[in-house]
């Protein structure tokens, strides 16, 4: 289990100067050729998403105005807050900020032949599945994960195991990404 606080994470500026990324975790850890990766991006200007052949990307808008996503001949989609949207990461996708507002989004990328991610918003206590990896990011409220208290802009990631996230207040929202390994693959095989 790895814990993080977005406000204390290192920031990597994009080469095109249109934004920055905070990497939460990769699996396998510290590998450039990852099977899955979670990150938070701040987007300051219109531009294209980086290409990652063989990967799927699920992007969830956390803050800022809506973002218009366009992939020629594939889709046009308006990304709205807290509504995950998946697309192939090997296609050119242009992002256009609405009203010029900066936005922040959560990204999870998975290698299509190894694993698949599902992203959802939780508003109550839940328990994860034991054989799956995952990432949580607190949008608001106070959540208990084991002996750790997680609040706004904090989270955790894990590569397997069963974990219970308890909402400690009457209301709260948490982004949860679950990683499902495809048949013939498991975290034990790749570490």
Swiss-Prot record:
Belongs to the Ves family. Pfam families: HutD. HAMAP family: Ves. This is Protein Ves. SUPFAM superfamilies: RmlC-like cupins. It comes from the Bacteria. Signal peptide: none annotated.
